[in-house]
């Protein structure tokens, strides 16, 4: 893991997994204001509480939930195996700041849709949006949306998610629901959902 600041509002991170080997994260961030920031590179998609806010070292279980793995690119039903990451550009920020957190947060990104270390296979870009509400310290309520087309056949990939989490001190309570529709190469669509 190599991270640092180029300037007071400009930083970067490069994380490599040497076992594979592959680049896991490689991005640059420009953070001019609390309300408007820009990130460019390869990194975790801003979809779901568990994919965005919980890294394996912080996670309580040995594996991510099946719904997240099957619908967000860990072992996706569309064939992606990307640990919830992709290449793209994202705007993000927060409003109504309190001590250490923003009450309202947003993420909006445009991504390749092919996953980790993979060149784009079509001309379509995938869109990901997330809104987060934190009414009090430790409590987070979030909603996510993902729209994209994958592969050279431009097969549909749509995901929705909603969840809540309380993480303060020794207490962590988290619930999340994710659903999606995936176009299949043989024709038809697969609808999936899970908690």
Predicted segments — roles?
Residues 132-195:
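Detector for outer-membrane/organellar transmembrane beta-barrel domains
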